[in-house]
Amino acid sequence: MAAKIKKGDRVVILSGKDKGKHGEVTQALPQEGKVIVSGINIITRHRKPSQANPQGGLDRMEAPIAASKVAIEDPKTGKATRVRFDVRDGKKVRIAVKSGETING
């Protein structure tokens, strides 16, 4: 199946604690149906002290979020939109449904 959301895309979070926030996809995990978005779904991991890290402490990191919970940001309006595919000049391109604009990538 074609990838509607790719690395580098601007997306809008549709549900959850970060609903309404915008971010950029830093990693797409198509096998799991998830994406990692910069600054979204931040989790805290408690690290025990070890020889490599004698202090231990808290690590904050971005966790994957379900791809169904994000939507591509329309390049024209900045709002969430669905994506369709079209062939233009012999190349398959992604098109924002709301505005008809071509999505880069």
UniProtKB/Swiss-Prot annotation:
Gene Ontology MF term list: rRNA binding; structural constituent of ribosome
Keyword Transmembrane helix found: no
Protein name: Large ribosomal subunit protein uL24
Any one Gene Ontology cellular component term annotated for this protein: ribonucleoprotein complex
Family membership: Belongs to the universal ribosomal protein uL24 family.
Presence of keyword Magnesium: no
Function noted in UniProt: One of two assembly initiator proteins, it binds directly to the 5'-end of the 23S rRNA, where it nucleates assembly of the 50S subunit. One of the proteins that surrounds the polypeptide exit tunnel on the outside of the subunit.
Subunit structure: Part of the 50S ribosomal subunit.
Encoding gene, per UniProt annotation: rplX
Keyword line: Ribonucleoprotein, Ribosomal protein, RNA-binding, rRNA-binding
Example GO biological process: translation
Recorded superkingdom: Bacteria
PROSITE patterns: RIBOSOMAL_L24
